[in-house]
């Protein structure tokens, strides 16, 4: 029986790029893998075919030979070199290092393994969070704060090596300096080579037998440090300031982490903030509401005078432009919204009561509002 065309097996054109071949292989390998198709002989055979096809087409030299001579280029000696064995005794021997990241990705999905190699290069230090509480005014206008942060710093005796001065780290006897442990696992479908970080040296390849006495071999010591922080005007609840390089020290020469300062703002007794605007409710007297006039209004900058019109009602709002929160970056300020409510006096002198009775007598039902209200009452209850 003639053998199938390798390009057809992977479902790609003969002019397909290496990246297209790789994508097609990964898709088919996951689809027909025996673990996802237990007992399916057809899927098992298909899996073998796509592996054989990919081994040849992923190698530029083998691909060129196949394009020129077809399957005959690999039939000398009875079998192709370096290919995959049949399912059966011994089965497949998958070494993730030999097939690049293809099987590393596939088998990390199927077996929970991966080809995560030990990190040996520089690594950034851990970040630190600090919660800072400000008063309403401090958040509005900005301020300077000194905070105290506890963090790890590079040991000043061993300079971060963790080794006692005059000593040197030794090669790890478990991984022999590679930082990795390779384990072979036999499965019903072959042998899986699992690569993991060495538990003895944690991927470093070296161990410390004579540690620094000050840091105990960690290379860092815990210290409390005071840091001055500039709080910009206009900052709000939940916003965050970032101080680069003020976090934990990096590993293997890596940069320090960052310090994140999370802002909290205490509630104000009378002011309420919404965005860059400030809201305040103030009482006015019955006389001021009726006659209008000048009243005093508290603002973030102090008391200011404001003239309200006669007949001002409870719930009326006025806007004081530019009296709100400064915009971050100095681009102007928000506004202050003033809502007034009429405060009814609880205690009146006899003179005040007399004047109000006279006012009530004179007022009668002459206002349009009252006429409208009493007319609606008469209509509702059938009055004449």
Swiss-Prot record:
Cofactor note: Binds 2 Zn(2+) ions per monomer.
Cofactor(s) essential for the protein: Zn(2+)
Record CDD domains: DnaJ, DnaJ_C, DnaJ_zf
Swiss-Prot/TrEMBL keywords: Chaperone, Cytoplasm, DNA replication, Metal-binding, Repeat, Stress response, Zinc, Zinc-finger
Coiled-coil ranges per UniProt: none
Sequence ranges assigned to domain J in this UniProt record: 5-70
Main location: cytoplasm
Keyword Methyltransferase (UniProt): no
Source species of the chain: Caldanaerobacter subterraneus subsp. tengcongensis (strain DSM 15242 / JCM 11007 / NBRC 100824 / MB4)
Recorded domain comment: The J domain is necessary and sufficient to stimulate DnaK ATPase activity. Zinc center 1 plays an important role in the autonomous, DnaK-independent chaperone activity of DnaJ. Zinc center 2 is essential for interaction with DnaK and for DnaJ activity.
Positions annotated as CXXCXGXG motif repeat: 155-162, 172-179, 198-205, 212-219
Positions of CR-type zinc fingers: 142-224
Protein name as catalogued: Chaperone protein DnaJ
Subunit annotation: Homodimer.
SMART domains in alphabetical order: DnaJ (SM00271)
Gene3D superfamilies associated with the record: DnaJ domain, Heat shock protein DnaJ, cysteine-rich domain, Urease metallochaperone UreE, N-terminal domain
Cited function: Participates actively in the response to hyperosmotic and heat shock by preventing the aggregation of stress-denatured proteins and by disaggregating proteins, also in an autonomous, DnaK-independent fashion. Unfolded proteins bind initially to DnaJ; upon interaction with the DnaJ-bound protein, DnaK hydrolyzes its bound ATP, resulting in the formation of a stable complex. GrpE releases ADP from DnaK; ATP binding to DnaK triggers the release of the substrate protein, thus completing the reaction cycle.
GO biological process, one term: response to heat
Chain sites annotated for binding Zn(2+) 1: 155, 158, 212, 215
Protein family per UniProt: Belongs to the DnaJ family.
Superkingdom, taxonomy of origin: Bacteria
GO cellular component assignments: cytoplasm
Cited Pfam families: DnaJ, DnaJ_C, DnaJ_CXXCXGXG
GO MF, one example: zinc ion binding
Origin organism lineage: Bacteria, Bacillati, Bacillota, Clostridia, Thermoanaerobacterales
HAMAP family to which the protein is assigned, alphabetical: DnaJ (MF_01152)
Residue numbers binding Zn(2+) 2: 172, 175, 198, 201
């Amino acid at each position: 029986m003639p053998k199938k065309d390798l390009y057809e097996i992977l479902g790609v054109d003969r002019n397909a790029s290496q990246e297209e071949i790789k994508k097609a292989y990964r898709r088919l390998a996951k689809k027909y893998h025996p673990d996802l198709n237990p007992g399916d002989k057809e899927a098992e055979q298909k899996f073998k075919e796509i592996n054989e096809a990919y081994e040849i087409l992923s190698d530029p030299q083998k691909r060129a030979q196949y394009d020129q001579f077809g399957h005959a280029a690999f039939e000398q000696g009875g079998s192709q070199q370096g290919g995959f064995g049949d399912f059966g005794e011994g089965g497949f021997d998958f070494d993730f290092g030999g097939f690049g990241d293809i099987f590393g990705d596939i088998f990390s999905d199927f077996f929970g393994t991966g080809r995560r190699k030990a990190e040996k290069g520089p690594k950034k230090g851990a970040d630190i969070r600090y919660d800072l509480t400000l008063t309403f005014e401090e958040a509005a206008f900005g301020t300077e704060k000194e905070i105290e942060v506890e963090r790890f710093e590079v040991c000043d005796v061993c300079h971060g090596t963790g080794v006692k001065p005059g000593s040197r780290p030794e090669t790890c006897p478990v991984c022999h300096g590679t930082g990795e442990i390779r384990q072979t696992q036999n499965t019903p479908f072959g042998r899986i080579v699992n690569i993991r970080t060495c538990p003895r040296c944690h991927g470093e390849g070296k161990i410390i037998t004579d540690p620094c006495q000050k840091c105990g071999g960690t290379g860092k010591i815990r210290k409390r440090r005071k840091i001055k922080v500039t709080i910009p005007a206009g900052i709000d609840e939940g916003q965050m300031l970032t101080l680069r390089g003020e976090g934990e020290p990096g590993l293997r020469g890596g940069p320090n982490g960052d310090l994140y300062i999370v802002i909290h703002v205490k509630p104000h007794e009378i002011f309420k903030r919404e965005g860059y605007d400030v809201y305040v409710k103030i009482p006015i007297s019955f006389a001021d509401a009726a006659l209008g006039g000048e009243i005093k209004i508290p603002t973030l900058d102090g008391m200011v005078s404001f003239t309200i019109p006669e007949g001002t009602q409870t719930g009326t709002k006025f806007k004081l432009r530019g009296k709100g929160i400064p915009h971050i970056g100095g681009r102007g300020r928000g506004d202050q919204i003033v809502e007034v409510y009429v405060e009814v006096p609880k205690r009146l002198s006899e003179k005040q009561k007399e004047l109000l009775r006279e006012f009530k007598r004179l007022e009668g039902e002459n206002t349009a509002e009252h006429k409208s209200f009493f007319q609606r009452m008469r209509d509702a209850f059938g009055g004449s």
